[in-house]
Amino acid sequence: MPWDFNNYYSHNMDGLISKLKLSKTESDKLKALRQIVRERTRDVFQEARQVAIDVRRQALTLESVRLKLEKTNVRYLSPEERADLARLIFEMEDEARDDFIKFQPRFWTQGSFQYDTLNRPFHPGQEMDIDDGTYMPMTVFESEPSIGHTLLLLLVDTSLKSLEAENDGWVFEEKNTCGRIKIYREKTHIDVPMYAIPKEQFQKKQTAADSAHLIKSDSVFESFALNRGGREAYAVESDKVNLALREGVRRWSVSDPKIVEDWFNESCKRIGGHLRSVCRFMKAWRDAQWEVGGPSSISLMTAVVNILDRESHNGSDLTGTMKLIARLLPEEFNRGVESPDDTDEKPLFPAESNHNVHHRAIVETMEGLYGILLAAEQSESREEALRKINEAFGKRVTNALLITSSAAAPAFLNAPSKEPSSKPINKTMVSG
């Protein structure tokens, strides 16, 4: 008989969603790890600022700067990196040094933890990912771009390398767009991309927070950001948000993570609350099929949004909605998946004419998902249906009683989501 999988997907105790969502305890633990990184980063910048103050007040020599840095967390850098950092602080122009002394780093979490689509890992070796950007004012490098670029990289690396040295099982990795600290015991890594924003916009943020007496508290800053006044006060022009790069000729890339965050939040409002759950399910399918690799989370999310924007569907019928997505997903990826951030220069997934072996393998695996869901629906027993659908999402759900006989098809379907009228996106950056 036809089986219905709505409870399989949505039951809050035994269903797939319950196996994917982090508990409050798990979420709080990740926030605590994030806070450790933030506090260390803040401390490292404070140490560097104090040395910069001493250079201005005491007319230190380069050797004196180097010796002072040796007594800080900078000691965890390599000798070459320590020498570079000492030189950068020593050679700062007066205006750049004054601004460096004045401003503190601010933090903004991006990615799945911020979107509320972060799943528990499935295969051994898979990790939860927190992206937590560090932001500093652009005037540090207005006169000489290389100063601000290298300074940010070295100071954030100092933070992560010092944590690596002090915590067993914490491992630093250098990435092109971020520093990463892997925390194996918690199956987690924290990425710290480094951004620069214009001094003027940074000052507006700081003034708004000061006036609300919020500047001292990470948690209060985040609460402030959630209300309308806070978000407006923290607006930043997206073309002024610069991401530091380690590799290649370009030192900076215009990149505002809030573009994608705002796009996804608007998509959830437009399509419905089921969008977040469906994105979680597709990421769970990806994690079950590939121990490493597979389509990126943002490419899956974008493809799902594209499909549900176009196609009539009943958001409360997860069985039907997941079949709809599974049927159309290969075609969506063969067309190519463009980023919702129009500043991205490359597609999230190339069109079929540009596929290599890796891309073709991904689409072939996608093509199998629809068949699995149909076979599960037509299984002879609940137990067989459970075994079959778990081929797609992994053996997370074990209660076959969640699978029920299929009810009549719903009489009313949601119309495809209309394309929203063109309007400026509220692109913000918040300190955490």
From Swiss-Prot:
ATP binds at R180, S255. Disruption phenotype: Deletion of dncV incrementally, but significantly, enhances swimming and swarming motility compared to the ECOR31 wild-type. It also enhances biofilm formation on abiotic surfaces after 48 hours of development. Mg(2+) binds at D129, D131, D191. InterPro entries: DncV-like_NTFase (IPR048445), DncV_C (IPR048446), GAMP_synthase (IPR047805). Binds 1 Mg(2+) ion per subunit. It catalyses: GTP + ATP = 3',3'-cGAMP + 2 diphosphate. Its EC number is 2.7.7.-. Its cofactor is Mg(2+). GTP binds at Q110, G111, S112, F113, Q114, Y115, K283, S297, D344. It comes from the Bacteria. Residues 423-432 have a biased composition (Polar residues). GO terms for biological process: defense response to virus; nucleotide metabolic process. Keywords: Antiviral defense, ATP-binding, GTP-binding, Magnesium, Metal-binding, Nucleotide metabolism, Nucleotide-binding, Nucleotidyltransferase, Transferase. Residues 413-432 are annotated as: Disordered. GO terms for molecular function: 3',3'-cyclic GMP-AMP synthase activity; ATP binding; GTP binding; metal ion binding. This is a complex CBASS locus with the loci capE-cdnE-probable diadenylate cyclase-capV-dcnV1-cap2-cap3. Belongs to the CD-NTase family. A01 subfamily. Cyclic nucleotide synthase (second messenger synthase) of a CBASS antivirus system. CBASS (cyclic oligonucleotide-based antiphage signaling system) provides immunity against bacteriophage. The CD-NTase protein synthesizes cyclic nucleotides in response to infection; these serve as specific second messenger signals. The signals activate a diverse range of effectors, leading to bacterial cell death and thus abortive phage infection. A type II-C(GA) CBASS system. Catalyzes the synthesis of 3'3'-cyclic GMP-AMP (3'3'-cGAMP) from GTP and ATP, a second messenger in cell signal transduction. Is also able to produce c-di-AMP and c-di-GMP from ATP and GTP, respectively; however, 3'3'-cGAMP is the dominant molecule produced by DncV in vivo, contrary to the 2'3'-cGAMP produced by eukaryotes. By producing cGAMP, down-regulates csgD expression and expression of flagellum regulon genes, which leads to the down-regulation of rdar biofilm formation and flagellum-mediated swimming and swarming motility in a temperature-dependent manner. This is Cyclic GMP-AMP synthase. The gene is dncV.
